[in-house]
């Protein structure tokens, strides 16, 4: 049976205390809180899957309640002259795997986009 770890930045982003018998953990707002508390909970519970509930901005006309998955995102990155804008020097090296864990996709940001800033988001 798979073990799920359900996360939310605040209790305002969901209306349940549990999901499929698993507690929804509040991890706090921002990427530092997300990284620190998600890591702590993964170490404690050793889940098979981590699911984060919450709000996200977008530049398209998605509706509230639609489920979005992240494929590949470049954000908050400007390490020129070491790499192209939106990339790190590690871009293109392939996937990184945590020891003993399956392929992992992870994304976090603390920037707020709206349609008036679309030019910035598309750099």
Model-derived features: where do they sit?
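Glycine-rich phosphate- or other oxyanion-binding loops that anchor nucleotides, phosphorylated ligands
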Residues: 4, 8, 12-123
């Amino acid at each position: 049976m798979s073990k799920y770890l359900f996360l939310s930045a605040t209790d305002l982003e969901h209306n349940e205390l549990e999901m499929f018998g698993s507690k929804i953990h509040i991890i706090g707002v921002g990427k530092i809180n997300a990284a620190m508390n998600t890591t702590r909970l993964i170490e404690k519970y050793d889940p098979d899957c981590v699911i984060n509930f919450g709000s996200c901005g977008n530049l398209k006309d998605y509706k509230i309640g639609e489920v979005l998955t992240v494929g590949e995102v470049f954000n908050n990155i400007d390490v020129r002259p070491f790499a192209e804008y939106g990339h790190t020097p590690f871009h293109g090296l392939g996937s990184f795997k945590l020891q003993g864990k399956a392929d992992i996709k992870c994304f976090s940001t603390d920037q707020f986009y709206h349609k008036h800033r679309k030019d910035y988001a598309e750099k």
